[in-house]
Structures are given as structure tokens and as C-alpha cells.
Amino acid sequence: MGGLMKKNTVILGIESSCDETAASVVKNGNEIISSVVASQIESHKRFGGVVPEIASRHHVEQITLVIEEALTQANVTMDDLDGIAVTEGPGLVGALLIGVNAAKTLAFMHNLPLIGVHHIAGHIYANRFETEFKFPLLSLVVSGGHTELVLMKADNDFEIIGETRDDAAGEAYDKVARTLGLAYPGGVQIDKLAKEGEDTFHFPRAMMDDGSFDFSFSGLKSSFINTLHNLRQRGEEPNPNDMAASFQASVVDVLVSKTIRAAKKYDVKQLLLAGGVAANQGLRKRLIQEMKLELPDIELIIPPLSLCGDNAAMIAAAGTVSFLQGKRSSYDMNANPGLLLEDI
């Protein structure tokens, strides 16, 4: 590659914020040359959630192998890269450190620019593999740790116009799944059951009509757990499909109604779905239906399932945007579990 004629920007992305160790080579911020993800789901399953200590240990074991595999699959060497992008935060500090230290070491050894990336910016930029962004745009970010409505008027310009005041939607999914005795990760299991059930329990829709774009899922979670507990105390075992469908209907109602209201208010050109819960079939289906009805002129962009969960291609995509804007991180960059999206 190299030389003055070089037109392509080739970035290595590294992601280790939670329980996936991932590396990816991306060209021009929108073409995946390779993407390798080592998942730890099996190791965390018996604990019903991610154990930070176990996650860190897995990252240490996997990080070098995953990076080497990504370079091999892409048929590139370190000399072909223009820079290295890595998730700087938010996430589990011990997990983040593994990726950050690997990226810093490689960047230093090969004299390459280092670009720290916000994990949620990555989820949003996963949509760049689908299409170019048209501003202003709105992203509904739904994951295990985040539920946010993010307005963008330009690349890397993030304004959070709504967020959860307590539990993230993905967190509520996992807790509700545990009370039903479902395996981790719970979101997928609830989604499957919900397809076969009906919304017979009519759980609360918190903050649905309060005028803000904020969310709250702790009341729904409590209502679900109490309903299940009361039924079991009476010797009844409720239909898990209906319980799941009722829970999911409540979450999806709130997410979709607030998103559509925000899209109307801010007169956006595109609506993006982002984050792990973007894989949820119930949410996807409902968003597509409601957008067709309410906002047929706004382009709805939903990432493929392979790019909803944590991956490094999205980090490379977001990193490419920062790289082309001239943003660089210094070699003393550290893992930042409390990194704010609006600060980047």
C-alpha cells in the first residue's frame, strides 16, 4: 500500500470493554476487511452475568491472537495500517485496560497514530457500514449499559437528548430473564419467548407521556418481579411466553414512542438503531412498522445482527472519522470507564 499515492485509510480497531475481545481491519471507515470476535458468553453463563475478573483474564489470553487473526484475514501487516483505534471507555476498567495497553504498545512499536474511541460512538458508527450519514440524524442506542437518544448534527458531534434515569433496557432484560430462570444473556431468550406470547399482563410504561425523552425501566422490572412472585405464592406458574411478551411490549412501546417523537421534533434525515439490543427482533419489527406509518420520509438504518453486539469493526469505523478529523490520542492514554460521549 504505502507511498504518496495512497488514497485508502486503513485502521485496525481493538475492542475489549466488556466480555468480547475483538479486532478488525477497516478500509475508509465503511468497508470491513476482517472482523474477529472472541466471545466469553460460555464462561459467564453459570454466573448469570459478566464477572469482571474472569473477563479480564480472558482478554489477556485472547488479545494477541485476535489481533494477529484480524491482520492475517485482512492480508495486511502493521506497515499497511494508517492508525490504531481502541475503545477507551466506558466499560469494565480491567477489561478496557487490556485493549488499551495492546493498542498503545503496537502504536508505539510501529510508530502509528493512536485513536481512543468511545464505545457508544462505535455502536453508532456501526451503521456507517450500511450507508453514509446524513445530518442531522438521531440514534437510538440500546445496550446492556446504555439507553440513550443521541442527536448528531455532524460527524463526532454527539448530543444526548434523552437517557435512562435508572436501569438500561438491556440490564432490565437480563434481570427479568434471570427471574424466569433463563440462561445468560437474557435479552435473546426473552425475545424468543415474546414471539410466542401475548401482552396479557400490561406492565407499566414509565415516563411515556411526560414530555421528556428520558427513560426509566426500574419500575417495570419491579412490577415484573412482583407479579411473578405473587403468582408463584398463589401456586400458579404463569405462561413464560406471555410474561416475556408483556415485558417486551412495555420496553418497545416506550423506546419507539419516544424515538419517533424526538425524530419529529428535531426534523432529522436519518434514524439509526445502535447497540446490543438493536438485535432484538421485537424492537426492529416495531420500529420499522411505526416509522413507515409516522415518518415514511426519514431513512431508518438498522445494522446487521453481526454488528449489533460488541465488535471492533465499529471501533475502527468511529476511529477512522476521528483520524480523518486529525484527532490523536497520546501514548499516556488510559482506560476511562466513566468516559462521556459528549466529551469526545
UniProtKB/Swiss-Prot annotation:
EC number annotated for this UniProt entry: 2.3.1.234
Q: Which reaction does it catalyse?
A: L-threonylcarbamoyladenylate + adenosine(37) in tRNA = N(6)-L-threonylcarbamoyladenosine(37) in tRNA + AMP + H(+)
* GO process terms (BP): tRNA threonylcarbamoyladenosine modification
One of the record's GO molecular function terms: iron ion binding
Keyword Metal-binding on this protein? Answer: yes
| Keywords assigned by UniProt, alphabetized | Acyltransferase, Cytoplasm, Iron, Metal-binding, Transferase, tRNA processing
Q: What is this protein called?
A: tRNA N6-adenosine threonylcarbamoyltransferase
Which organism is this protein's natural source?
Listeria welshimeri serovar 6b (strain ATCC 35897 / DSM 20650 / CCUG 15529 / CIP 8149 / NCTC 11857 / SLCC 5334 / V8)
